[in-house]
Amino acid sequence: MEMTKLSCEKFLAELASKAPTPGGGGTAALVGAAGVALGNMVGNLTTGKKKYAAVEADIQALNTRADALRKELEALVQADADAFAPLAAAYGLPKDTPEQAAHKAAVLEKALDAACAVPLEVMEKCAEGIALVEEYAAKGSVMAVSDAGCAAALCKAALQAASLNVFINTKLMADRERAAALDAKTDKLLDEFVLRADAVFASVTNKLRNK
C-alpha cells in the first residue's frame, strides 16, 4: 500500500484501524510535510509582490528548498511503513533453542537500530523545516503570518512525535552505548528546534494579538 497515494479519508481510516501501518512515525512525517507546505505557501503568497521585492530572491530560494523538503518528508511516510516489516519479522522469530534465541536477539537488535533511522531522518527534515519557517515568518507576507505560525507548530509537533519513535526502539536495544548515542542525537534536535519553533509561534502570536 502506497501511503501517500491514499486519499485523506482512506489514510485516516487506515491510521485509526488496528493495522500496524501507518502509525506514529509515518504520521509525524506527514505532519512535517504539511508544516513545510504551509511555509511554502507563505512564500508563494509573497513572491511577485512589489512590497517584498527586496526579499524576492531569498523567498524564491526558500521556496525551492521547501518544495524539495516537502517531497522528502512525503517519501518518509512510506519509508516508515516499509521499515516496520523487518522489525515485525524479527519479533516473530522462534527462540525455542539457545541458537534460535541468539539468532533472534541479533536480528532484533539490527532491526531496532534500523527502525530508528527513519524517525531520526524525519526529525532532521523537520528541524530544517523549522529553520525555513523562521525565515518565512520574518520575510514573508504579513497577510500570511498566521500560516507561518501554523507551519512552525506543525513542524514542532512532527519533530516531537518522531522522537518518540526513536525512543521506543532505543529503549529495547541491548547495545546501550549505541542506544545512548541515538538518544543523544534525538535530544540535541529536540533541545534546539523545539525552542526555535516556539519562538516563531510566540512571535506570530504577538503580531496577531497586539497592534
Question: What annotation goes with each model-predicted range?
Answer:
Residues 3-6, 121, 168-169, 197:
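Polytopic transmembrane helical bundles with strong interfacial aromatic enrichment
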Residues 38-58:
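Phosphate-handling active-site elements
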Residues 51-89, 189:
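A structural-propensity feature for long, helix-poor, extended segments
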